[in-house]
Structure formats: structure tokens, C-alpha cells
């Protein structure tokens, strides 16, 4: 059976692993997931990630989660735009997450980026998720 929301699955895996205090989490690899993980790493929400290749062409991402004095750095991560309900935002209507302490990750014509980068480049797009 195919997965209908791969990005939502990755977000849920990250959330569950952080709630359990895990150091790493593994999720199937894809381009979209890699781009979202790039943004999370740039913004300092995760330590990093590595692509693990398996025989037969399958590959996974091994994500290193980040903690600050035992508390998870990601306090809240949620999917905004889902396959059944797409959410788009222009630069003017782009909401801030917790008064700028968090980020929104957007899919724009210029690639996957945070809301801060989208405002700098004056571009809107689909709001994939919010992280705080």
C-alpha cells in the first residue's frame, strides 16, 4: 500500500522520537524530505541527517535530533498543508510562528525554504509545516 502523505509521516516520526527522547530517527528517503531536512538543519532544529543506502536501491535518512539541556529543541512540529487540504500563502499574508521564534517551511517556485528566506526573496508558496 502506498503512503498518501510521506512528509506528514516524517514529521510524525520526528515528533514521536523527540517525545520519547530518542537521539536518532530513521525515515525513508525522498527529495522532498531531504529538502525539508536541509531547512531544519539550517535553522538549527536538528543536528543533521545522513542518507543510508541499502542493497536493492532503497535508501533512508537517519536524522540526528537535537536537545537543549535534556529538552527537545523542536517543541512543536505540525503539518499545515495536507494532500486533501492545500494551504497557500503570499508574502503579505504569511503568518509568523510564535512571534518569529519558530518557522514555517514553504514550497515556493524557488525551492523549499523557511518563511524568513521566502520574505527576503519576496516569494510565497505552499505552507508545508510549522516548527517551533
From Swiss-Prot:
GO terms for biological process: translation. Keywords: Ribonucleoprotein, Ribosomal protein, RNA-binding, rRNA-binding. Coiled coil: none annotated. GO terms for cellular component: ribonucleoprotein complex; ribosome. The keyword Ribonucleoprotein applies. The keyword rRNA-binding applies. InterPro entries: Ribosomal_uS8, Ribosomal_uS8_CS, Ribosomal_uS8_sf. It holds the Pfam family Ribosomal_S8. GO terms for molecular function: rRNA binding; structural constituent of ribosome. NCBIfam families: PRK00136.1. Belongs to the universal ribosomal protein uS8 family. One of the primary rRNA binding proteins, it binds directly to 16S rRNA central domain where it helps coordinate assembly of the platform of the 30S subunit. Part of the 30S ribosomal subunit. Contacts proteins S5 and S12. This is Small ribosomal subunit protein uS8. It comes from Parvibaculum lavamentivorans (strain DS-1 / DSM 13023 / NCIMB 13966). The lineage of its organism: Bacteria, Pseudomonadati, Pseudomonadota, Alphaproteobacteria, Hyphomicrobiales.
